[in-house]
């Protein structure tokens, strides 16, 4: 017989603000991919990615709600539940935002493709539900974020949330690199790929250490390790932010203008531009991470 005390079910997992938002996530998530599979349809890698995002987020949200409702998360000794849910909410926000942009861009049209307009209406409904799904995950991030004067998990802080965004942006960069980017053309651009890979790897280690609750078991202070790594990542990203555009958009090596005969979706110039943009975005994210961490340290010492 269970002697742990307290009710078997945690009603707050549903009736709290966060619980209600998660119920909406399950509703919109299930509705979105059900509409796609029923009539709206999808094709190619873009459509498959969108359906995967909606199904993955729906399944994992159900798992989180079930664990919190039945208090099963207390049995997961190897996981820091607060860090896990905060990191997942941020990741789901980014993934659903991407899907909410991609699906309407490639599959939704205001014109009917045939005499039957039902497919158009289904795809419009999918686009609306996908946008609402993104909003619900963004609201969860807002509700569970770290608040001044309250104890919180590291992944719920601005620094922790930025780590998830940095890793996600790196994945976008890897996707662009794999799509006709021609990064092997120069040794210098291969260095840029090494920068992206190294920073992504260390960022993932930081996230995993927090989710598994092993961040405090390091031989050196975790916060100091993160600050040192962030400074190194900024320096490395600065080099990539300079090198990549020079070797692909300077007239000596490449072209500053998009080739007129470049096919949409198969154009190396487009991939190179995407890498450039997201490299600068990640550089800004790492700088913001360092500024926030330093400001938090100064406030804590007062």
Curated annotation (Swiss-Prot):
Record keywords, A-Z: Membrane, Repeat, Transmembrane, Transmembrane helix
Compartments in which it is found: Membrane
Domain annotation MARVEL: ranges: 13-149, 154-298
Organism superkingdom: Eukaryota
Subcellular location, principal: membrane
Transmembrane segments: 45-65, 87-107, 124-144, 158-178, 191-211, 225-245, 273-293
Membrane topology category: Multi-pass membrane protein
CC terms in the record's Gene Ontology section: membrane
A Pfam family recorded for this sequence: MARVEL
Family that this chain belongs to: Belongs to the MAL family.
PANTHER family, A to Z: MYELOID-ASSOCIATED DIFFERENTIATION MARKER MYADM FAMILY MEMBER (PTHR17068), MYELOID-ASSOCIATED DIFFERENTIATION MARKER-LIKE PROTEIN 2 (PTHR17068:SF5)
The protein's name in its UniProt record: Myeloid-associated differentiation marker-like protein 2
Record organism: Xenopus laevis (African clawed frog)
Gene designation per UniProt: myadml2
């Amino acid at each position: 017989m269970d002697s742990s005390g307290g009710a078997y079910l945690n009603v707050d997992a549903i009736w709290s603000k966060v619980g209600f938002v998660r119920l909406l996530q399950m509703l919109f998530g299930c509705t979105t991919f059900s509409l796609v599979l029923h009539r709206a349809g999808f094709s190619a890698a873009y459509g498959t990615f969108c359906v995967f995002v909606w199904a993955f987020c729906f399944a994992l949200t159900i798992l989180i709600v079930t664990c919190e409702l039945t208090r099963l998360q207390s049995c997961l000794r190897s996981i820091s539940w607060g860090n896990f849910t905060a990191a997942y909410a941020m990741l789901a926000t980014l993934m659903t935002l991407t899907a909410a942009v991609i699906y309407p861009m490639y599959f939704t049209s205001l014109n009917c493709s045939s005499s039957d307009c039902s497919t158009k209406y289904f795809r419009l409904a999918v686009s609306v539900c996908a946008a609402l799904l993104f909003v619900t995950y963004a609201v969860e991030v807002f509700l569970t974020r770290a608040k001044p004067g309250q104890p919180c998990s590291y992944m719920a802080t601005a620094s922790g949330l930025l780590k998830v965004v940095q890793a996600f942006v790196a994945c976008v960069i890897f996707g662009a690199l794999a799509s006709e980017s021609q990064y092997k053309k120069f040794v210098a651009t291969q260095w840029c790929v090494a920068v992206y890979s190294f920073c992504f790897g260390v960022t993932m280690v930081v996230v995993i250490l927090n989710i598994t609750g092993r961040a405090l078991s390091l031989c050196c202070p975790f916060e100091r390790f993160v600050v040192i790594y962030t400074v190194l990542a900024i320096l490395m990203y600065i080099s990539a932010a300079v090198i990549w555009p020079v070797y692909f958009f300077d007239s000596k090596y490449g072209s500053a203008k998009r080739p007129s005969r470049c096919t949409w979706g198969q154009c190396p110039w487009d991939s190179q531009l995407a890498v450039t943009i997201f490299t600068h975005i990640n550089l800004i994210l790492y700088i913001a991470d360092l500024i926030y961490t330093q400001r938090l340290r100064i406030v804590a010492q007062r």
